[in-house]
Amino acid sequence: MTIPQLVERGIDIIKYIPGVDTPGDDYKKIHAKDPSWPKFPSVRENDPIDVLANYAIRPSDRFVDIDFDCDAARKLKDIYFAGGIAQFGRDRTGHKLFEISDPTPFSKKRIEFGVKCLLEMRGSGCYSVLQGKLEKKVKAEISYLGNYEALTFQECNEAYLELGLICQFVEGMEGHFNDYLICIIGEMARKKMNHQTIRNIAENLITAVDRPHEKDFRKEKMKTVNAILKEEKYSTIEKLTWSESKVGQVRKVIEEIVGHTEEYKKPQTMEWTALSTIMETDYPPMPEIVEGMLTPGLWFLAAKPKLGKS
């Protein structure tokens, strides 16, 4: 997709000169102060393409940029963020641009594990390099996807949160995988996350860490997940060797997901009473039922013609 085509769709794009508007070889960081990058003039449809310039998008509430900052995010991006207007960045895979059908104000959301950024959702007040130099020998390029179907803000945010949580789980993985599942699945269940949401997250986590050399890896691990949920004696991520800040980062994302999904409620079992017990029990009359039974009968008698001699 060309820059003019993106501009035609209403996407705000600016251009800047690497090494002039950026410090040294850091071609992604615009440091120009006059004007500052938020005040750079927007590129217009009929502007000629400057081969020496970098082009960057200024996301908005309507056009949101998802930045896949880790391997797990890039591996699962088409599961959680299928389609999109365009894909761009390093190797044309680092970012995806989506239109939001119900623009909702936000600036930037960021999911981290420790000091490492794993996933970002960028809106107003941010910019991302669409095309041009990222480093001396590394370029950003655009790939047109052609999917114009918009997401709702809730759909976009829920996908972002679930993918971000999986990235945290991949980053924090330790010990035997089954033991690890006991801790993270237990943590989500303890926080009253919907069980189907937990299963979806677990399935995609297993995809992210797939071990093809282990026979039936996916099938066996999902059996473990279902067994953990069925047991209802849940473990916690506090049993892992994570720092307190990492535990807090993960719990924050879990709490946000729980806030957007219906809480899991254990199905209630039916209570059975023997027929003999019912027959031997003297139940008090219920006026509303008796009234409902008698009223039609009384109306019938009142309407019935009288028999006998006239």
Q: Which residues does each predicted region cover?
A:
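Long, contiguous hydrophobic alpha-helical segments, chiefly transmembrane helices and signal peptides
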Residues: 65, 128-129, 185, 189, ...
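Modules that initiate DNA replication and primer synthesis
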Residues: 93, 100-103, 134, 148-265
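Conserved phosphate/metal-binding and DNA-contacting active-site motifs used
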Residues: 1-167
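Short boundary motifs at domain starts and secondary-structure transition points
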Residues: 57, 170-174, 291-292
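The Walker A/P-loop phosphate-binding site
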Residues: 264-310
